[in-house]
């Protein structure tokens, strides 16, 4: 029992950590303040070895598929968020033990110990925010918010540790709690947690937006205006109707898969957003949303797939994207001699590049709209790029900077050991075999699904049936 103070201090740190996370979440939902557990997790995923991250991703996708836990993208994000919160609360337990240890050695310096503890938490959190880039609230608000939470946490935890010690004055133990004290702290932490969640739910209540569009059942001849135009209407009308149970040809914005390097997508302010285009160009230019939206744009029906999509997986989606051909922007800024690639940087720290030859492809779009409405936040608002013939890992969202460079450029996932070219493999998936709805004329069983091969196209799909 001599080490009972360690368990008690860890429990107090954990419970107060729950309250810290709850209040932090409330600030996120109401005022868009930084959420330290998620940001800490995002920072860790950026500094860990690429091979480790790759193994974790593949394992997670396999478990989600194998256990049938739901949609791969949303379930994976939920797992990431759960891990982020869990590891932060576990860190709270370590914080509690560290404070208790310091107080046991120098109880007369309780004020200084509390101050130093809060300062360390604040400094580490601010360092994380600095590494990721400050959010929409700005540096001053970010620092004040983090400092307030950190010092309040340290003060309350110090007070609880000392209060527990006084309850056992005969043992001079600091940090040991009895059952009643533990229940008091547990109740208070859960109360703060539930109250914060309830208030945060009010702030995050979904509101009807133009981005919440339903899936279009069939693609028509007017769905594209760019080089990847749809077939004539007569050809479309002659198609075999989709088998019952086949996924829609166009994915709704809400159902379009989301894979990125963030626990939460960057919420950029469209009124202040700008994208700088510089480097080896004649005329460096800064673009704002109206500069892109108010110029001639083209629409293309685009299929996108994640490179981590397993055979038969659900990380494939199709949508109508509208944007400005990149080649038009290149003509405006003018490329200098020696420019060989375009380096792209995003608000979340993601980066990728494409060769000048690819950038001149008329199908490459700087996308500002999706499904007839501005890009949803989770899909790259206000600007992302579409590059035909590549997996999603090569297509940055939330773009804030483009630079013409004299080298091959850098790629976030390429530097972590992933494919340099990311050219899609041929994919075919059976969605449905409608055995209970045979064709009334022929008696044949309808079979529905998808086939995709990037820019190579699909000429036909053959189906084998075991007799």
Question: Which role fits each region the language model picked out?
Answer:
Residues 1-5, 9, 35, 72-84, ...:
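Membrane-helix interfacial "entry" motifs
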Residues 8-33:
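N-terminal signal-anchor transmembrane alpha helix
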Residues 34, 77-82, 89-96, 133-138, ...:
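Structured, non-membrane catalytic/scaffold regions adjacent to prosthetic-group chemistry
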Residues 36-72:
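Extracytosolic (periplasmic/ER-lumenal) interhelical loops and adjacent juxtamembrane/interface segments
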Residues 59-91:
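Individual transmembrane alpha-helix segments
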Residues 96-177:
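N-terminal secretory signal peptides
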Residues 171-190:
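N-terminal secretory signal peptides and thylakoid transit peptides that target proteins
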